[in-house]
Each structure stands twice: as C-alpha cells, then as structure tokens.
C-alpha cells in the first residue's frame, strides 16, 4: 500500500506496509463528567408570575410580576464594590461553614462565573472560561476545592493538584490531571484569589494545612508540577528503563542502564581503592561494552515531516536479529498512532489525535526513523501499552 501523504513531502519510499498491533484495542474513555459540573443557563421565565389573576387590581398584579423579575435580574447583575466583597465572602462561608456541595447549583455556578468575569473586567484583564474535554468547567467547584485545601500556595507546595483534579472525574486516559487543573486555576482564579488575600477578605490556615496534608502528597510517577519539557524528559527516562534487562555479548544479562548515580558511585569508588589495578581494568572493559550499547542506540536517524514534535521521544536499539524502537507518545490512544515500514529500512510513525482541541497541546505529527539496514516489513510488530509507551520490533531482512 503506497502512502500518498509521504509522496507529497518529497520523500522516496518503496511499498509501505502497515504494521499491526499485537494486543487488543483499549477501551474507549468513558464519559465520567458529572452533569452537575457543567453550568446550566439561567432561564429568566415568567411562568410563575400571576399576571394579575386572583388579585384585587390589575395594577397590583403587574407590580408583583415586575418585582419578581427584578429580583432575578439583580442576582446576575454586577454589584458595587461593597456588595462584591460581601458576595465573595458568602461563597466561602457557604462551602466551608455549612459543608454544602462544592459543585453548587446551576444558579450559583452562573452567578460565580459572572462575578469572576466582572472582576477580570474591572482589573483590565482578559478572562476566558476554561473548558475540559470540550465542556465548560465548573470554576465554582474548582474554587471551593482549592480554597478548602488552603489556597493555591498550599495546594502547589503539597502537590495536591491531582486530588483537586480527581474530584472532577477525569477520563482514565487523562495522564496530566495535576498540570491541567493547575493551569485552569492559574488562568481563571489565581488573580481573583490574590485580590481577596490582599484585601483581607480571604484568610486561610496555610501552615496547619501544610503539616496535616504532608502525608497525602501526590504521587510523582507520571505527574509533575514543572514545565512540559521537564515532564516529558522524565517520562523519557522512565521509558528507557522499561526494558531494563537486555542481552550483551554472549548472552550475559546486565543490570538496567538507568540507575541512580548516587547509589552506584560510592560502591564503585570503594572497590577501586580496595582491589586495585586488576579490578580497575575489569571496570574499564565493562565501560567499553556500555559505550558500544550507547553507540548502537544512537545509530538511527529520526526526521520530522511537517511541524517538529519534540515531545515525542524515540530511541532505537539494535539486537542480534532485529531493531527495537522505543517511542513515547503521551496523550494518544493506540488507534490514533499509525505505523508503516519500508523494506529499504524506514519506519514511519504518524500520530493523529481525534480531538485537536485538547488541553495538553497534542498536535498531529509524522516521524521517519531511518534504520541502517534493510528490514522485513511483513514481520514487523508493535505493542502499545498505557501512558503512550510504544514498542516496535523490526526484524532484519532475511
């Protein structure tokens, strides 16, 4: 099957062969959104108005109807500075003192959204209501969840953003819960919180929460609070240790290549001092084997076709009878990643997310892995596990 997309990029290939996955299709992400989290529009109907029926005069009925309608409109209209301060305090008292539902009613959600919009407008700041998987995010629930934990600084210091995000029931495929909801809060509510703190309207027991919640720190295996590049580099290091044991030389199994330097530097130093020159020579030969392994790993050339996708990590290793390609494509499902191979020694990895407007900035990409020998595309296989870890075995041409 010839890939017409590759011909448009002026790349010369032979007959590209589709590579099939070896495991079953993962389950589709469930729609776990809570309907109460999505703000509903407030209908300003007059179905409950009497319209003058049953009253002692038509004028009395009209006055009663206008008063009820005026009360409804005032609930959504911008307040003066003094009234805004009282309303902001009410949001905290309702959630903390009375223990009501953090999500709030649809009326409360819309009212709080209007209040935040008015604050940003008064501060001459741009405000864009956040969306999570295409649905408006309940910022009232996000505000109450963070404030009840002690505010932005406490949640960030104690790495509680995952706990905040889990309360929104994100899909199982969402692997950046902490980063996503911290980003939502920073863009929509952080300036609002700072203003309340500076005005003395928001007093939170930060030190007490830091001590009490230290045990509930967020696991850092797949999450991080740093930049996107730092998180992806961490994921790449985890991918390198995925296949920890490999064959070296005449079938000898070595230890994993990814280790903590602090754990191996001190024992090595002691052995060199105690044993002497003979042990030093043996260590040098082992270093030579590791160097050869590194050279084999960096032998392949990876080229981007179209926009550069530096967040996709690809490593290639050469074994006795095949090439082994280890790739990390976080945020993509198996059906969104396409693999093709050419007998001339080229493997094409294409990623096409179904949802282009995603909160992680995942964009379509195409990478060509140029191997150093001819391959057998008919026996090429791929396995994709959780968190976007992709393994491709490419046998040599027989």
UniProtKB/Swiss-Prot annotation:
Residues 25-87, 213-236 are annotated as: Disordered. InterPro entries: A-crystallin/Hsp20_dom, ARI3A/B/C, ARID_dom, ARID_dom_sf, HSP20-like_chaperone. This is AT-rich interactive domain-containing protein 6. Belongs to the small heat shock protein (HSP20) family. SUPFAM superfamilies: ARID-like, HSP20-like chaperones. Keywords: DNA-binding, Nucleus, Transcription, Transcription regulation. One of its GO terms (cellular component) is histone deacetylase complex. Pfam families: ARID. PANTHER family: AT-RICH INTERACTIVE DOMAIN-CONTAINING PROTEIN 6, AT-RICH INTERACTIVE DOMAIN-CONTAINING PROTEIN ARID DOMAIN- CONTAINING PROTEIN DEAD RINGER PROTEIN B-CELL REGULATOR OF IGH TRANSCRIPTION BRIGHT. The keyword DNA repair does not apply. It is found in: Nucleus. Residues 106-197 form the ARID domain. One of its GO terms (molecular function) is minor groove of adenine-thymine-rich DNA binding. GO terms for biological process: glucosinolate metabolic process; regulation of transcription by RNA polymerase II. The gene is ARID6. Residues 305-398 form the sHSP domain. Its main location: nucleus.
């Amino acid at each position: 099957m010839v890939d017409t997309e590759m011909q448009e990029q002026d790349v010369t290939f032979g007959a590209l062969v589709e590579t099939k996955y070896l495991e079953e299709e993962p389950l589709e992400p469930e729609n776990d959104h809570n309907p109460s989290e999505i703000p509903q529009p407030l209908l300003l109907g007059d179905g409950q108005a009497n319209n003058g029926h049953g009253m002692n005069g038509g004028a009395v009925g009209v006055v009663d109807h206008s008063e009820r309608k005026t009360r409804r409109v005032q609930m959504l209209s911008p307040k003066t500075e003094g009234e805004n301060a009282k309303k902001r305090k009410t949001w905290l008292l309702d959630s903390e003192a009375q223990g009501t539902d953090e999500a709030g009613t649809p009326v409360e959600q819309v009212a709080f959204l209007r209040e935040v919009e008015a604050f940003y407008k008064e501060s001459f700041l741009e405000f864009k209501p956040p969306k999570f998987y295409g649905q408006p995010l309940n910022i009232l629930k996000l505000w109450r969840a963070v404030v009840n934990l002690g505010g932005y600084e406490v949640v960030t210091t104690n790495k509680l953003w995952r706990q905040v995000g889990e309360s929104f029931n994100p899909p199982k495929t969402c692997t950046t819960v902490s980063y996503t909801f911290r980003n939502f809060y920073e863009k929509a509510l952080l300036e609002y919180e700072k203003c309340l703190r500076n005005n003395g309207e928001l007093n939170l027991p930060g030190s007490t929460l830091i001590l009490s919640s230290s045990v509930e720190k967020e696991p850092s295996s797949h999450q991080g609070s740093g930049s996107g590049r730092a998180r992806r580099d961490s994921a790449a290091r985890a991918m390198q240790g995925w296949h920890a044991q490999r064959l070296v030389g005449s079938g000898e199994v070595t230890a994993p290549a990814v280790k903590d330097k602090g754990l191996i530097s001190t024992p090595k130093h002691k052995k060199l001092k105690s044993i002497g020159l003979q042990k030093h020579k043996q260590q040098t030969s082992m270093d030579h084997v590791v160097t050869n392994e590194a050279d084999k790993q960096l032998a392949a050339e990876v080229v981007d076709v179209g926009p550069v996708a530096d967040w996709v990590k690809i490593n290639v290793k050469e074994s006795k009878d095949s090439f082994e390609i280890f790739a990390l494509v976080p945020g993509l499902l198996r059906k969104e990643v396409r693999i093709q191979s050419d007998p001339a020694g080229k493997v094409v990895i294409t990623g096409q997310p179904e949802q282009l407007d995603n909160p992680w900035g995942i964009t379509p990409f195409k990478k060509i892995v140029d191997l150093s020998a001819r391959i057998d595309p008919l026996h090429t296989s791929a396995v994709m596990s959780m968190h976007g870890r992709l393994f491709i075995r490419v046998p040599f041409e027989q």
